[in-house]
């Protein structure tokens, strides 16, 4: 069972108490490029590869994806526990990061290899390969993001450190894979050959970028030996860390909006705007805008505050989605207004990505301040759990909504179906994102001033970490 402790914290539990050297910052962030290229390939192309290239039944793939995401979401918590319990001369992050990358790259190549199977054998192969890929990706993804709160305790430096890997991740996943993946696959031969060659290139890039990260991470071990965490303790951590619960809640609400936008966009442009070609313009411009949002995040927080940065992150997408909704009704073929809407939406989501990473890093420090334990692995595993759970349930919700309104593939849709697509694409995401700010405003208390007190308290080896009662009274 977890107990309050008096172990040295803060300064002893971060690699750099102040400014992080540029080499460390950028080589750490560089790893996210390959990491999210491999994730983007699975997220964007695995379904069409399974159904159109190796001919797995679409109904089976839909069920498989849903089951795999649910399993993988809870597997993340287990991985977070393993990371927090790891003790080695290389620390608790690097071993999992290195081993997970190599295994995941190998499984990724196998997944995009055609073994000329059919029937039950093909279904078994697809299920095993896809689930194994998700599990092995978790092995390296959880420790990667768990490094963030351990690089520095300086608030402004943490904002910079948090945003850099998100920028590289957006370039890898949204711009390279989602934006130009189709053209690259065609250029590499198209069909199975194009997919397999592209997978080999991505796997090699993945290994190289993570190797650069691992080699340049400081070898200094942080913190003292801490009490081991059991699976039961995970729920105790969530129960006792109130700010972790509210951070999870607001990130969940926001992510519901993102998942609906990404899941419905293809249908929106094909059947509401009647122009599938507009999807590429929307996605490429939006991807660039997301990177811009991430780049300006540290400056926005410095000029305004984190609270106002998150307010912008919630309001901008709502404005952009309303522009997109009105454009779809009155000028569905207007590509300029569509691009403008996409840029506004994704500038906001770029700011949110920066905010979310900083929120979770602050929650780690707050957990140490309040409970005497950091639990980076558990905290950051909850982020990936949220993404996977919302992806699973959003996909299911979209399918049910389209079915209930009479959606017919490759046909002109009824007005009821078009309106349901509009609601799924524009209204539900906007509501989810605005609700996220309501939760933040009313329940999340780790603002700039409060975090200065937290960091000051945990940075002193002589400071005894407060009990829950003392912390709540101080708040």
Segments predicted by a language model, with ranges:
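Membrane-embedded alpha-helical bundles of multi-pass transporters/translocases
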Residues: 2, 8-468, 472-475
């Amino acid at each position: 069972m977890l107990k309050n402790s008096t172990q040295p914290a803060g300064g002893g539990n971060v690699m750099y108490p102040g400014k992080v050297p540029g080499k460390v910052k950028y080589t750490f962030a560089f790893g996210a490029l390959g990491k999210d290229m491999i994730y983007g390939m699975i997220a964007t192309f695995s379904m069409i590869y399974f159904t159109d290239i190796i001919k797995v039944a679409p109904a089976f793939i839909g069920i498989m994806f849903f089951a795999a995401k649910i399993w993988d979401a809870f597997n993340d918590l287990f991985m977070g526990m393993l990371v927090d319990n790891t003790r080695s001369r290389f620390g608790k992050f690097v071993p999992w990061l290195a081993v997970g990358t190599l295994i995941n790259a190998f499984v990724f190549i196998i997944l995009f290899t055609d073994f000329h199977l059919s029937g039950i054998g093909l279904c078994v192969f697809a299920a095993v390969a896809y689930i194994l890929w998700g599990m092995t990706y978790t092995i390296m993804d959880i420790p990667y993001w768990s490094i963030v709160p351990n690089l520095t305790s300086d608030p402004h430096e943490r904002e910079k450190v948090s945003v850099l890997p998100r920028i590289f991740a957006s370039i890898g996943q949204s711009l390279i894979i989602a934006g130009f993946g189709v053209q690259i696959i065609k250029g590499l031969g198209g069909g199975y050959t194009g997919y397999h060659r592209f997978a080999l290139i991505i796997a090699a890039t993945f290994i190289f970028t993570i190797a650069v990260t691992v080699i340049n991470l400081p070898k200094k071990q942080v913190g003292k030996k801490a009490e081991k965490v059991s699976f039961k303790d995970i729920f105790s951590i969530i129960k006792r860390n109130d700010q972790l619960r509210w951070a999870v809640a607001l990130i969940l609400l926001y992510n519901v909006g993102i998942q609906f936008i990404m899941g419905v966009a293809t249908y929106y442009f094909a059947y509401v705007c009647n122009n599938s070609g507009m999807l590429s313009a929307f996605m490429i411009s939006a991807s660039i805008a997301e990177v811009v949002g991430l780049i300006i995040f540290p400056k926005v927080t410095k000029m305004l505050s984190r609270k106002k940065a998150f307010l912008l992150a919630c309001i901008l997408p709502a404005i952009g989605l309303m522009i997109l909704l009105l454009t779809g009704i009155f000028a569905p073929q207007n590509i300029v207004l569509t691009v403008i809407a996409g840029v506004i939406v994704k500038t906001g989501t770029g700011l949110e990505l920066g905010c979310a990473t900083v929120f979770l890093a602050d929650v780690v420090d707050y957990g140490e301040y309040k409970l005497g334990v950091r639990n980076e692995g558990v905290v950051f595993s909850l982020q990936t759990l949220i993404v996977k759970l919302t992806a699973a349930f959003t996909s299911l919700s979209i399918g049910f909504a389209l079915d209930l309104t009479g959606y017919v593939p490759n046909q002109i849709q009824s007005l009821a179906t078009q309106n349901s697509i509009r609601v799924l694409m524009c209204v539900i995401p906007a509501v989810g994102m605005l609700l996220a700010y309501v939760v933040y405003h009313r329940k999340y208390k780790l603002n700039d001033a409060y975090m200065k007190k937290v960091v000051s308290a945990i940075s002193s080896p002589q400071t005894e970490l407060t009990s829950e009662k003392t912390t709540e009274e101080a708040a």
